[in-house]
């Protein structure tokens, strides 16, 4: 009798455990994401931020940046970055500190075109397509160079209205292609990401509505003039969107297709990319929104450091990269950076190790760091809580330490 009772209890216990396990496994994983306004407000909690930043194609319509059948291999370097100690603002940090505190979901370091360090975190994998944010601006700059080399754009001194007559009679009358590339149009613009009334957020609202191809002109034509063109720097995502519209008008080709033709396929990217659109089947948002895997961002950086060459021939004019990656003598660029043609430069006071460096940078911690003098490319994919200003550790201090370490090995 006691034995039968024991067996019954044991059986019930096993059934309970099995049912409990089934119940646990049946719980759906949380795949919810935030919206575009949440990204720019900086209102997402950490896990949801990662889910959102890795799935923005669920927020905006996109066009595929097609990869080819031939993938360019990235081999392992004999110089491996196995450990790192560095000082930032008087405190000592290591690699895990930087990843954790600056919320880096992906880091890739290429030395002489080979992988010296690669790390993924917060659930991100080598196959995750992550948002570039404004790093896309540096891609667009390179496409302008390609359009000049291909003869679609005659000169950077051409007026913008030659290619975009929609801007005739606006504050962009008399602004050159070069002025746009330098963010020095002289047109008034407020880039504040967290201010719903800013020009940047007005642009975002058009993108959220996704109901009109080329809607950017509805905002840009209404802007007023603040200064003469070519004199003062004023960061404007709207102007890079205009540059994208200009390239598309000149080439008569969607930006994603031109990027695929000139870079994605010939460079040997491993995966298709995506590019945000202003409307379904509409125009690419030139100022942001390229989605790619970490290694493909790295391949683009190495392509730039190698002179933007395909089969030994550069896709941009002679001297383009040196010009694009050098600071322009215009007022208004503050902090440790200068600005070229949609590329950030680094001022000497940030450290001699950054001499000749140029960078693509995007909100929430995205960057593409190119150090030609040491043949080093570093890609950082971030999931920081706020669009700007919330990194715990100065990225430039970390980047300098990586370069110094690899130089010493």
Spans of model-derived segments:
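Active-site Gly/Thr loop motif
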Residues: 269-274, 325-377
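Active-site-proximal alpha-helical segments within enzyme catalytic domains
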Residues: 183, 239-246, 286-309, 366-382
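Structured C-terminal helix/loop/strand segments within mature extracytoplasmic catalytic/sensor domains
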Residues: 27-40, 360-409
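Active-site helix/loop module of the DD-peptidase/beta-lactamase fold
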Residues: 131, 150-188, 222, 249-287, ...
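Catalytic-site signature segments of enzymes, centered on catalytic residues
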Residues: 126-127, 192-194, 201-280, 288
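Active-site-proximal loop and beta-strand segments within enzyme catalytic domains
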Residues: 84, 92-98, 114, 124-127, ...
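Active-site SXXK
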Residues: 113, 130-156, 180, 243-247, ...
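N-terminal leader/targeting segments and the immediately adjacent pre-domain N-terminus
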Residues: 24-125, 153, 182, 219-221, ...
């Amino acid at each position: 009798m006691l034995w039968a009772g024991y067996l019954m209890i044991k059986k019930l216990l096993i059934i309970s455990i099995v049912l409990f396990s089934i119940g646990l496994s049946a719980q759906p994983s949380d795949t919810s994401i935030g919206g575009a306004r949440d990204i720019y407000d900086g209102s997402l909690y950490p896990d949801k931020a990662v889910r959102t930043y890795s799935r923005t194609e669920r927020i905006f319509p996109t066009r595929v940046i097609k990869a080819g059948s031939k993938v360019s291999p990235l081999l392992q370097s004999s110089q491996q970055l196995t450990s790192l100690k560095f000082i930032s603002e008087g405190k000592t940090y290591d690699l895990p500190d930087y990843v954790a505190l600056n919320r880096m979901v992906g880091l890739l370091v290429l030395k002489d075109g080979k992988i010296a360090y690669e790390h993924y975190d917060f659930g991100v994998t080598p196959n995750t397509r992550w948002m570039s944010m404004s790093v896309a601006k540096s891609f667009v700059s390179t496409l302008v160079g390609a359009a000049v080399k291909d003869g679609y754009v005659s000169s950077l001194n051409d007026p913008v209205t030659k290619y975009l007559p929609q801007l005739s009679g606006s504050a962009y009358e008399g602004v050159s292609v070069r002025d746009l590339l330098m963010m020095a149009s002289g047109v008034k613009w407020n880039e504040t990401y967290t201010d719903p009334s800013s020009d940047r957020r007005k642009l975002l609202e058009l993108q959220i509505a996704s109901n009109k191809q080329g809607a950017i002109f509805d905002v840009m034509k209404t802007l007023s003039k603040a200064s003469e063109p070519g004199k003062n720097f004023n960061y404007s995502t709207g102007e890079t969107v205009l540059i994208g519209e200009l390239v598309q008008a000149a080439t008569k080709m969607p930006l994603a297709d031109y990027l695929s033709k000139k870079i994605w396929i010939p460079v040997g990217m491993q995966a298709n990319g995506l590019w945000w659109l202003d409307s379904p089947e509409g125009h690419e948002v030139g100022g942001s929104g390229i989605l790619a895997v970490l290694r493909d961002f790295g391949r683009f950086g190495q392509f730039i450091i190698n002179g933007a060459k395909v089969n030994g021939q550069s896709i941009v004019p002679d001297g383009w990269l040196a010009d694009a990656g050098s600071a322009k003598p215009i007022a208004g660029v503050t902090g440790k950076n200068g600005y070229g043609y949609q590329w950030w430069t680094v001022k000497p006071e940030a450290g001699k190790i950054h001499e000749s460096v140029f960078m693509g940078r995007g909100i929430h911690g995205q960057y593409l760091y190119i150090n030609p003098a040491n043949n080093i490319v570093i890609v950082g994919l971030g999931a920081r809580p706020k669009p700007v200003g919330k990194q715990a550790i100065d990225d430039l201090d970390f980047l300098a330490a990586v370069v110094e370490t690899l130089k010493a090995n």
